[in-house]
């Protein structure tokens, strides 16, 4: 065999050997991301869970009383629950103290719901202020409509709307109730079916919080939303308040962001006060629960990403869970619910 042929043969064998050699870890195909969690429950602290559940079942008749792993619970037809822990003293319920502001339902006929609530004195309506001078409505669509995708108007915009004779749109919109333990509850219409549909929040940095939920919990975004990056997610809170609002002084509505788990939205505005948000454990809204298929895989992922773990995996009735802390100190429980679980 000539030198040229021997050289060619060596080259062929070398190529074959390299092709057959196992690829290194760095060259391996990336693992598929874990399936996004679904919204499982909202967990409230209450001095009287049974009374609270009766209130919600009356206000939202699609819901029903149940028990889940020993917790008194309210079941919504979209496979979402509100769980309760009985406490000896009223829980702190300041809606601006923590990341969890309020929670709410979609309803089929908002005006019909409003009339029903008015007929029942045990249900307290929470009015919306239309300006900082006073004046209230029960439904946001009974005052000047927002503009530019913002659900309110600033002082200057209200003055302009008055000057132009702008009229309320009427019809469905959003409204609020005061519930047991001083809970703040939103109901909005009109939708094809009644269901628990959102948790509204405050965040220190709304865009950064959205990135956090995407990165660590594989959250989905609302349609048409394009997230910022870590390089530009920190922004200054909008300078002007707008109305209508639950507070007479109005509220800051920019910036805003949010994510979706299953068919439940978690939306937020920036913190409304100058006081940093505190942890949610022990408050009226203690935490939210998200269901995952493989808790061990999620625990490993979150540890590797440096997420703050409030409680390592623990027994929760006939399943397991772990508790982590979100970007503004909100507690989030991950509940192991294998595929096919109810």
For each predicted feature, which ranges?
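Mature N-terminal segment immediately following signal peptide/propeptide cleavage
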Residues: 33-68
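Extracytoplasmic/secreted envelope proteins and their assembly/folding machinery
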Residues: 39, 49, 53-57, 100, ...
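Vicinal oxygen chelate
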Residues: 27-34, 115-201, 220-260, 265-270, ...
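Mid-chain, structured segments of secreted extracytoplasmic proteins
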Residues: 76-118
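Conserved active-site tyrosine of GNAT-family acetyltransferases
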Residues: 52-57, 117, 182, 209-214, ...
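Short, surface-exposed ligand-recognition loops at beta-strand->loop->(often short) alpha-helix junctions
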Residues: 43-48, 106-108, 201-206, 290-293
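N-terminal secretory signal peptides that target proteins for export/translocation
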Residues: 1-9
């Amino acid at each position: 065999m000539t030198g040229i042929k021997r050289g060619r043969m060596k080259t062929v064998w070398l190529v074959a050997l390299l092709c057959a050699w196992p690829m290194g870890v760095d060259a391996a195909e990336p693992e598929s991301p874990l399936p996004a969690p679904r919204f499982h429950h909202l967990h409230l602290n209450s001095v009287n869970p049974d009374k609270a559940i009766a209130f919600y079942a009356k206000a939202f008749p699609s819901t029903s009383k149940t028990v889940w792993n020993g917790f008194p619970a309210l079941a919504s037809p979209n496979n979402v629950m509100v769980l309760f822990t009985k406490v000896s003293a009223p829980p702190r319920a300041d809606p601006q103290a923590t990341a969890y502001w309020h929670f709410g339902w979609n309803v089929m006929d908002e005006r019909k719901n409003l009339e029903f609530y008015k007929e029942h004195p045990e249900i307290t309506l929470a009015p919306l202020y239309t300006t900082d001078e006073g004046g209230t409505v029960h439904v946001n669509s009974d005052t000047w409509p927002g503009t530019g995708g913002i659900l309110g108007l600033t002082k200057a915009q209200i003055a302009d709307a008055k000057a132009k004779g702008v009229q309320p749109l009427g019809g469905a919109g959003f409204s609020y109730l005061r519930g047991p333990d001083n809970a703040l509850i939103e109901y909005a219409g009109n939708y094809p079916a009644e269901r628990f549909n959102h948790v509204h929040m405050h965040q220190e940095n709304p865009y950064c919080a959205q990135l956090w939920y995407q990165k660590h919990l594989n959250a989905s975004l609302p349609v048409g939303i394009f997230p910022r990056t870590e390089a530009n997610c920190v922004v200054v809170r909008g300078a002007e308040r707008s109305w209508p609002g639950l507070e007479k002084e109005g509220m800051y509505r920019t910036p805003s962001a949010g994510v979706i788990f299953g068919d439940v939205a978690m939306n937020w505005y920036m913190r409304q006060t100058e006081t940093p948000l505190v942890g949610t454990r022990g408050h009226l809204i203690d935490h939210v629960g998200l269901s995952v298929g493989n808790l061990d895989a999620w625990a490993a992922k979150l540890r590797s990403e440096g997420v703050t773990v409030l409680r390592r995996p623990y027994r929760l009735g006939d399943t397991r869970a772990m508790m982590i802390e979100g970007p503004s100190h909100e507690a989030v429980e991950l509940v192991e619910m294998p595929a096919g679980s109810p």
